[in-house]
Amino acid sequence: MFRGASAINMDAKGRIAIPMRYRDQLHVHGTGVIVITIDIQSQCLLIYPLQEWELIEAKLLTLSDTNPVERSFKRRLLGHAHECELDSHGRVLVPPTLRQYAGLDKKAMLVGLLNKFELWDEAAWQQQMDDSQTLIQSQDLSSQDRLADFSL
């Protein structure tokens, strides 16, 4: 499971180095192969170990190609999906189209979300964190069914 946020750098070739603490987990779940795609709700990228991505693909396969919304959903996720392999130094090349989508340049944030990562431009991540804080503070969490009984 992946957790925590890590400040990382992207090199001039568009590569990021996956932090050491995650590399073993990525190799346990497979051969260090990951799938990178867009997040259709936020301006960031989603990074899945291959076996986790295959579960997503199985769900996508159940969606209809004749329903325009379902087809568009599939097209967005699958059309941007790139299978990538970590090199011997734990680096992965983020394809240019995906870097452009997420506005990635040099400074980035890799955020563990249990079964996947989000990859954000550092400034966009900070703005999203500020927006999330405002949203959470403005809500009565006990009125949210799935959060009502959640306690820390």
UniProtKB/Swiss-Prot annotation:
InterPro entries: MraZ (IPR003444), MraZ_C (IPR035644), MraZ_dom (IPR020603), MraZ_N (IPR035642), MraZ_sf (IPR038619), SpoVT-AbrB_dom (IPR007159), SpoVT-AbrB_sf (IPR037914). Keywords: Cytoplasm, DNA-binding, Repeat, Transcription, Transcription regulation. The keyword Repeat applies. It comes from the Bacteria. It is found in: Cytoplasm, Nucleoid. Residues 5-52, 81-124 form the SpoVT-AbrB domain. Coiled coil: none annotated. GO terms for molecular function: DNA-binding transcription factor activity; transcription cis-regulatory region binding. It holds the Pfam family MraZ. GO terms for biological process: negative regulation of DNA-templated transcription initiation. One of its GO terms (cellular component) is cytoplasm. Belongs to the MraZ family. PANTHER family: TRANSCRIPTIONAL REGULATOR MRAZ. Forms oligomers. This is Transcriptional regulator MraZ. It comes from Shewanella denitrificans (strain OS217 / ATCC BAA-1090 / DSM 15013). The lineage of its organism: Bacteria, Pseudomonadati, Pseudomonadota, Gammaproteobacteria, Alteromonadales. The gene is mraZ.
